[in-house]
Amino acid sequence: MKKYKAGIINVTGYAGLELARILASHPSVELCSVTGRSLAGKKLSDAFPYLHSLDLPITESLEGEVDIAFMALPHKEGASLVPDLLSKGMRVIDISADFRLKDPPLYQAWYGFEHPCPELLAEAVYGLPELKRKDIASARLVANPGCYPTSAILGLAPAFKMDLIEPNAIVDAKSGLSGSGRTPTAKNIFCEASEDVCAYSIGTHRHQPEIVQELSLVGGGVIPRVTFCPHLVPMSRGILSSAYARLKQPVTDEEVKEIYRRFYKDEPFVKITAEPPHTRYTRGTNMCFIYPVVDALNERLIVISCIDNLVKGAAGQAVQNMNIMLGLSEDTGLKAIAALP
């Protein structure tokens, strides 16, 4: 069986490391090159002993033949590299936000930079397989969704698609600390984060336009108003989103659950649960657990969704996209089940 060759640009962040962990046991793909300027010259297995089977040198740029390149650089640092990678025949999956938004001015407004290659924004495919599978299959460039948007969009997409709710939603989301990256800050160091929960970027979080953009496409072009309020909670990984929207007409709890079951019936990584899910159900897996429920008294739909922010919210979804692009079974290398306790 042919093995495709993959490379990771910036393996040293949490998303890059999670990619390496997943690809280490992928039966159809060989991780052949990894970069990371801060650790260039070291072996990956020496710098991160838990990746003991990956005896690869960390280099400053990708080396050798690479079929598919994963970009795991911080926002705005990698966009200018993509045209060169594409010109060399590589297919690219970018885990940053650099190609998620379609409107170039939004990058200046929300990310503070002018996009260096806006001509690629129209070509880039938003990599949420449950909604864009056919486009992903033929894409040269896939924009891997953000962690919060993955949870929020999967939770609300059936309701918008089936016109169950008014185009006005609230998404209240809680994330583990790994979502803020490996670089220590006052928000994520132990003494500040332990035994503490805080909201941040209320109404100004840069994932908000991404959520709105994709839900508007699901809803037939109607641009929804989404109030997004993220929180940091003292756990290492996981996202739990609670979404609220007013129902357009009366509907029973079981009718809503059946709509969600039908919408996701063929999806390997989405499960509609009978009870509100826990983030620990998703730990280390590519699963998204969703619990829709009707608040009949207030005529609202409430949807609870949870994912592992580093897997379905980043590296696992990137590998899922890669599998689709390479014509592999979608769940290849992604069949892990969460470990409890």
From Swiss-Prot:
- Kindly name one Pfam family recorded for this protein: Semialdhyde_dhC_1
| GO cellular component labels | cytoplasm
Record carries keyword Cytoplasm: yes
Q: Write down the EC number.
A: 1.2.1.38
Keywords from the UniProt entry: Amino-acid biosynthesis, Arginine biosynthesis, Cytoplasm, NADP, Oxidoreductase
Keyword flag Ribonucleoprotein: no
What is the active site of this protein?
A: C147
Catalyzed reaction equations: N-acetyl-L-glutamate 5-semialdehyde + phosphate + NADP(+) = N-acetyl-L-glutamyl 5-phosphate + NADPH + H(+)
Where does the UniProt annotation locate this protein? Answer: Cytoplasm
Superkingdom of the organism of origin? Bacteria
Please name the pathway: Amino-acid biosynthesis; L-arginine biosynthesis; N(2)-acetyl-L-ornithine from L-glutamate: step 3/4
Where it mainly occurs, coarsely classed, is cytoplasm
Q: Name one GO molecular function term.
A: NADP+ binding
Could you provide one GO biological process annotation from this protein's UniProt record?
L-arginine biosynthetic process
Free-text function comment from the UniProt entry: Catalyzes the NADPH-dependent reduction of N-acetyl-5-glutamyl phosphate to yield N-acetyl-L-glutamate 5-semialdehyde.
Q: PANTHER family, per this entry?
A: N-ACETYL-GAMMA-GLUTAMYL-PHOSPHATE REDUCTASE, CHLOROPLASTIC-RELATED, N-ACETYL-GAMMA-GLUTAMYL-PHOSPHATE REDUCTASE, CHLOROPLASTIC-RELATED-RELATED
- Entry's family note: Belongs to the NAGSA dehydrogenase family. Type 1 subfamily.
What is the name attached to this protein's record? N-acetyl-gamma-glutamyl-phosphate reductase
Gene encoding this polypeptide? Answer: argC
